[in-house]
């Protein structure tokens, strides 16, 4: 049993909670969020994407009870003040989006946790892990503050790995056609990113993504070879990564699709899914995969290749958090 604390009970924190319910190895021992417990309980029970939880959810001033299990809830601004030692927390999921620097996330360890998993790209972390791609690099003796990368990197990395392992990537560009997130606004409103200052539900909004450059953290051989941007679109979840690369040698559509299918049924099973169906974004909502490779969209001209992978940027990513915490927890 792995005792887990959650810091930040927003979209990812709650998605992770739901996903963890199917993993008997994970035991949630505490939640920290500045939001009133009544609101936290309501948003856990009712979700616009995932639907009703289907379990009884109640709350008190200092706890939330789900299906008869009571979980302590705190409202601490400083992670150093959280009682992780008292709760015997093995791992803390840092999902506020605010404590992505190692020095800040490390406060959970000072408070008694053994490991911290950051649900975002991080700074000065001990290691960034994409499950299925570089998880075997994890060293429990030296890696204590761990980033799960971004949802987009989790989608991009499996596809890039297959291409690079089989043909070699010379260089490439990617675009993530990405659902809007809480960093955007419903109506035009000031934002440091002037494009994100525009209404999310009625615009296609180009913005930055660190996914292409972050790929080097999990596949060092691709450092400096990929770049790209995000195009935020008016849907609440369900995204796609469009990757165009120059390969070191020529490949055919059939060869690329065969390699992706083999990986999906082999080394990347559970992370990479292969489909031949003509799907749209709604079809992959609540899919737990990191990447659903769309074989019908593979295009090739000589050694230039375009491929597409879908991903549920909330649910798929949250399932990887469950996998990573389970993987790390087994070494404690």
Predicted regions and their residues:
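Short, solvent-exposed beta-strand edge segments and adjacent coil->beta transition regions
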Residues: 142-143, 199-201, 238-242, 304-306
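N-terminal Rossmann-like NAD(P) cofactor-binding subdomain of oxidoreductases
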Residues: 1-197, 299, 323, 331-332
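C-terminal active-site/capping subdomain that shapes the small-molecule cofactor and substrate pocket
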Residues: 228, 240, 244-332
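Acidic, glycine-rich segments within the central catalytic cores of soluble metabolic enzymes
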Residues: 165-236
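Conserved active-site and cofactor/substrate-binding residues in soluble primary-metabolism enzymes
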Residues: 7, 11, 38, 87, ...
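Short clusters of hydrophobic/aromatic residues that line enzyme substrate/ligand-binding pockets
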Residues: 64, 129-131, 145, 187, ...
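A generic structural signal for well-ordered coil/turn residues at beta-strand boundaries
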Residues: 60, 125, 200, 237-239, ...
């Amino acid at each position: 049993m792995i005792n887990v604390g959650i810091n930040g009970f927003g979209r990812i924190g709650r998605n992770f909670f739901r996903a963890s319910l199917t993993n008997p190895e994970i035991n949630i021992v505490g939640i920290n969020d500045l939001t009133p417990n009544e609101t936290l309980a309501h948003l856990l029970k009712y979700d616009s994407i995932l639907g009703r939880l289907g379990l009884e959810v109640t709350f008190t001033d200092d706890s939330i009870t789900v299906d008869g299990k009571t979980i302590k809830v705190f409202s601490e601004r400083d992670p150093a003040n959280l009682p992780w030692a008292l709760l015997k927390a093995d791992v803390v999921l840092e999902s506020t989006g605010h404590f992505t620097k190692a020095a800040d996330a490390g406060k959970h360890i000072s408070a008694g946790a053994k490991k911290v998993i950051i649900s975002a790209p991080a700074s000065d972390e001990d290691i960034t892990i994409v499950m299925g791609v570089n998880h075997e690099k994890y060293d429990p003796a030296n890696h204590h503050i761990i980033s799960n990368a971004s949802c987009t990197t989790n989608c991009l990395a499996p596809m890039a790995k297959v291409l690079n392992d089989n043909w070699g990537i010379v260089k490439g560009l990617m675009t993530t056609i990405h659902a809007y997130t809480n960093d955007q606004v419903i109506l035009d409103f000031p934002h440091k990113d002037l494009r994100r200052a525009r209404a999310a539900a009625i615009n296609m909004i180009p913005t930055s993504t660190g996914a292409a450059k972050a790929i080097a953290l999990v596949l060092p051989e691709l450092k400096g070879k990929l770049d790209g941007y995000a195009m935020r679109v008016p849907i609440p979840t369900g995204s796609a990564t469009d990757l165009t690369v120059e390969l070191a040698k020529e490949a055919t559509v059939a060869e690329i699709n065969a390699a992706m299918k083999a990986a999906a049924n082999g080394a990347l099973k559970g992370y990479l899914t292969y489909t031949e169906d003509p799907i749209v974004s709604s079809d992959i909502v609540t899919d737990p995969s990191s990447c659903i490779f769309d074989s019908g969209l593979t295009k090739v001209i000589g050694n230039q290749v375009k491929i597409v992978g879908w991903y549920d940027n909330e649910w798929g990513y949250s399932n990887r958090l469950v996998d990573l915490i389970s993987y790390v927890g087994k070494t404690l």
